[in-house]
Amino acid sequence: MNIKPFGDRVVIKKVEAEEKTASGIVLPGAAKEQPQIAEVVEVGPGGIVEGKEIKMELTVGDKVIFQKYSGTEVKIEGQEYTILRQSDVLAVIE
């Protein structure tokens, strides 16, 4: 992949949703809930947002939980990614 986000943005790749429920029911593609867990694949340099300096706290490889419906989805070389602001990330999974 060759994409470099500007400012306080990060590029994430969503983790695949579960194919089965906890009780063993297989879900068709449309019934799967969109995952809110992703892996950070690129990080912008940070910058000034609304007059405040934003330092990047995320690093490539972090597993994160992000806000639903945030960011912009893009497809590059057949892979789907989401570009969003660092502030749309709710937590890092350790």
From Swiss-Prot:
InterPro entries: Chaperonin_GroES (IPR020818), Chaperonin_GroES_sf (IPR037124), GroES-like_sf (IPR011032)
Protease found in the keyword field: no
Swiss-Prot/TrEMBL keywords: Chaperone, Cytoplasm
GO biological process annotation, one example: chaperone cofactor-dependent protein refolding
Single Gene Ontology MF annotation: ATP binding
Gene Ontology CC: cytoplasm
One Pfam family named in its UniProt record: Cpn10
Localisation: Cytoplasm
PANTHER family in the cross-refs: 10 KDA HEAT SHOCK PROTEIN (PTHR10772), CO-CHAPERONIN GROES (PTHR10772:SF58)
Entry similarity comment: Belongs to the GroES chaperonin family.
UniProt function note: Together with the chaperonin GroEL, plays an essential role in assisting protein folding. The GroEL-GroES system forms a nano-cage that allows encapsulation of the non-native substrate proteins and provides a physical environment optimized to promote and accelerate protein folding. GroES binds to the apical surface of the GroEL ring, thereby capping the opening of the GroEL channel.
Quaternary data: Heptamer of 7 subunits arranged in a ring. Interacts with the chaperonin GroEL.
Name of the protein in its database record: Co-chaperonin GroES
